[in-house]
Amino acid sequence: GIAGVAGNGQDELMEILIGEKPSSGNVLTFDGEDIGSMNSHERRQLSMFFVPEERLGHGAVPDMTLDENMLLSRPDSDGMTSNGVIDWKTVTSFSEQVISDFDVQTPSSRMLAKSLSGGNLQKFMVGRELIRNPKLIIVAQPTWGVDAGSANNIHQSLISLADQGSAVLIISQDLDEILSLCEQIHVLSEGRLSDAVDMKKDGLEKISQLMVGGQKS
């Protein structure tokens, strides 16, 4: 996990990780492959999935339905097309699975993304990525704006995914969330990423020091 106070480079880091900004050669690799020049679509094809902090306009298209947003997150539309034609019944089935599993409060998967509350849209976006069982999922502020019960559901889903062998990277301002979910913790401060904190040796005191601009390594 990556902890840090807002405004210390989290947005820029996420843009690099999801492919919206290029990175220098061999700085960013996945499964031994240099992905620095790959865009988001190409990275999704490698089974890298993302939940950005900004919901509308970044994580979801406001004027599209939940079904349409579900389809957009699939780089190859796997199982959702037949002979180049969208199978909307299958798309809706995936959407309804997310709505049910993550308790998304909406009358229908045909509702526009912008009609959902921030918390419900967050649950839909997280669920949309998790049901893909990705090799890697990067989530920024996974439970921002959701109620305690829904936050626990999202946390348990992330833990379950990790238990199945997926890599999970969480970027969060919520230190309690980072501490409860993450085995390795780094701190982002003033655009610099610390080494992993030895929780047994240094623990919370070291993380707190780094978050206010202490020595990064």
Give each language-model segment a name.
Residues G1-S217:
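Glycine-rich phosphate-binding loops of nucleotide-dependent enzymes
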